């Protein structure tokens, strides 16, 4: 005899697994979005830095440009802290759902180091 209807337990278990997947997806997506923002800011800082070096060719960078570059670095470091928090939330979420191995998370979602501000001479 073939069973056609699911039991209440089976239905609840399926719903529970779907909810787990949604929660993990949401936490991972937040981390990925924050990392993307961080990458864009990092690339912008690097481009700005090299453009200024090329334009000034060894001369001192104008203070307003240096101020702008340091503001970009502040923004980068702020987003980096957000990334660290999202990473932490993902790990905590995984732990709460019974997932204990996180080595692939560490490999996939590497957080770049904090950037230091520049002084007068680049």
Q: How would you label these PLM feature ranges?
A:
Residues 12-36:
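Short, charge/polar-rich alpha-helical segments
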Residues 31, 40-44, 93:
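Intrinsic-disorder/low-complexity detector
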Residues 8, 34, 62-65, 93:
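Terminal low-complexity, poorly structured segments
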Residues 1-16:
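Short, charge-rich amphipathic alpha-helices with coiled-coil/heptad character
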Residues 15, 19-23, 71-82:
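Conserved aromatic-histidine-acidic binding/catalytic patches
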Residues 59, 73-122:
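Amphipathic alpha-helical packing elements
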Residues 36, 40-43, 47, 88, ...:
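Generic surface-pattern signal
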Residues 41-76:
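Mixed-charge, low-complexity intrinsically disordered segments
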């Amino acid at each position: 005899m073939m069973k056609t209807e699911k039991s209440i337990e089976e239905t609840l278990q399926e719903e529970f697994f779907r909810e787990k997947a949604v929660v993990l997806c949401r936490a991972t997506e937040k981390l990925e979005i924050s990392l993307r923002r961080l990458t864009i800011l990092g690339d912008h800082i690097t481009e700005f830095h090299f453009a200024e070096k090329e334009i000034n060719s060894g001369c001192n960078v104008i203070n307003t440009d240096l101020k702008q570059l340091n503001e970009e670095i502040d923004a980068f470091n702020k987003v980096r802290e957000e990334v660290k928090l999202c990473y932490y939330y993902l790990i905590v979420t995984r732990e709460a759902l019974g997932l204990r191995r996180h080595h692939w998370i560490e490999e996939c979602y590497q957080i770049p180091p904090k950037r230091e501000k520049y002084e007068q001479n680049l």
